[in-house]
Swiss-Prot record:
Cell wall formation. PANTHER family: D-ALANINE--D-ALANINE LIGASE, D-ALANINE--D-ALANINE LIGASE B. NCBIfam families: D_ala_D_alaTIGR (TIGR01205), PRK01372.1 (NF002378). This is D-alanine--D-alanine ligase. It comes from the Bacteria.
Length: 331
């Protein structure tokens, strides 16, 4: 498969801002992602500059002549459509999904509703507003149960609840990060992740090789995701070829159902009892650190980190073509 144009000239892409940092709970990871992307783009002759959205005025991007933005922000106010909307108003092309798809993908409840409406498998869930409601959800969904913020990533604020007396503290932890708290049926089995790369406006998205994740005691938390060497990543996944293709198609369908573009990473559980895959969430601005999964999957497909970053940047675009809104206003 050809996922990269070897003749792409990084110097032709103009002045580029790598948006990183931000104000979400994932700021630390975003800074690591942004630093890696910045090095990669500069290695491909791109005129790239770091831009911490927590410290800079986005309006400066227009004033200082930036042509494109690589979004290396994670979580709220970076991956949820807010920055994308600002860049739409500024008329500056950006990487990844547009305003609506970004917003829906970060909101786990909304993405699960859309997937369910499309007939795509996702664990049962309940949206709760108190510890008492979380306890009621446990009775319905069964133990163990996952309690997490509806609009955060990197397993921040997530708890695995086994007993009713744990529900109140699990709810309070999740509510520290988001007033919308999601209780989700726990799926026992292997955790998989699948990167999806857009092939351009006239071609379909394509899944890269799956990664099977084996964390100590099955606990793939924030520390194990980004800073631990104890987690084991299997790529190739070791699954039968036909099963891997089917799960890749599921990730592509999840990507399409939300209207994503550019790239994303779908997180999937493979139920041990019957090998049924379940969609957990999709990340529209995935991590790009040295522990991150997208670069690992890309390498398995023959795409280097530097070439991946350059390809994503070259695909930067806008929901609304430049001049379309001003033309409508004149009409």
């Amino acid at each position: 498969m050809s996922l990269f144009d070897p003749h792409l000239d990084g110097a032709s892409l103009g002045k580029v801002a790598v948006l990183m940092g931000g104000v979400s709970a994932e700021r630390e990871v975003s800074l690591l992602s942004g630093a890696g992307v910045l090095r990669a783009l500069r290695a491909r002759a791109v005129d790239a500059h770091a831009f911490d959205t927590a410290q800079g005025d986005l309006g400066a991007l227009k004033r200082e002549g930036y042509a494109r933005c690589f979004i290396a922000l994670h979580g709220r106010h970076g991956e949820d459509g807010t920055v994308q909307g600002a860049l739409e108003l500024l008329g500056i092309a950006y990487t990844g999904s547009g305003v609506m798809a970004s917003s829906m993908a970060l909101d786990k409840t909304m993405s699960k509703r859309i997937w369910r409406s499309e007939g795509l498998p996702t664990p049962d869930w309940r949206l709760v507003t108190s510890g008492a409601e979380a306890g009621q959800a446990l009775q319905t969904l069964g133990a163990p149960m996952i309690v997490k913020p509806a609009r955060e990533g990197s397993t921040i604020g997530l708890s695995k609840v086994h007993q009713a007396q744990q529900c109140a503290s699990a709810y309070l932890l999740a509510a520290r990060y988001d007033p919308e708290v999601l209780c989700e049926q726990f799926i026992a089995g292997d955790e998989l992740t699948c990167t999806v790369l857009d092939q351009g406006r006239r071609a379909s998205a394509q899944a890269l090789p799956l990664i099977r994740i084996v964390a100590p005691d099955g606990n793939y938390d924030y520390q194990h995701k980004y800073f631990s060497d104890a987690t084991r990543y299997h790529c190739p996944s070791g699954l039968p070829e036909a099963q891997e293709r089917a799960i890749g198609r599921l990730a592509e369908q999840a990507f399409s159902a939300l209207g994503c573009r550019g790239w994303a990473r779908a997180d999937i559980m493979l139920r041990a009892s019957d090998q049924q895959p379940f969609l957990l969430e999709i990340n529209t601005a995935p991590g790009m650190t040295d522990h991150s999964l997208v670069p690992m999957s890309a390498r398995a497909a023959g795409i280097s980190y530097e070439d991946l970053c350059l390809r994503l940047l070259a695909m930067a675009t806008l929901d609304t073509p430049p001049g379309a809104l001003s033309g409508a206003a004149r009409a």
